[in-house]
Amino acid sequence: QRQMCIRDSNYPTADAVFAGEMDRQRALEAAGDTNLDELCEPTAKMTAAMLSLLSEEPGERRVLERLGYLLGRYIYMADALDDWEKDKKHGDFNPFLQCEDEPEALKRHARASLLLTIGEMGAALDLLELRHFGPILENIIRLGLPQTVEELQLPPKQRRKREK
């Protein structure tokens, strides 16, 4: 599957990162790892590698890499929180199922971690000179992502319906 466009492009380094991190993600989940930071890391590293390719300038590239890392962390956690009840029902791996917290405490902890990650994304975004789509990126990071976190606090049936 990863052989799609990135493999056919001029980005062999990103391809190697993706392959290694996808293998690492599978291994962590198969082992039943409970460390949320470790579990977020492969997705974070993949998005960091992807965003770092958007600039040739070293300083900007480093900021984009950090933004990508944080975005990947957000994606992994938000997806896990979104799938928590379904994964519990089907016996699938979910990092939040590894916690012994009650569901409401778990949601509060996840919310705090997600909002902290979003705050760091905003700080990284502030370091970039946005040439294109600045207002759109600002809206997504500062409004859209926090709204999604709040929506994930609701039971699945009360969440806004999204097309899959």
Language-model features: locations:
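Short, small-residue-biased leader/transition segments that mark boundaries at the very start
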Residues: 2-6
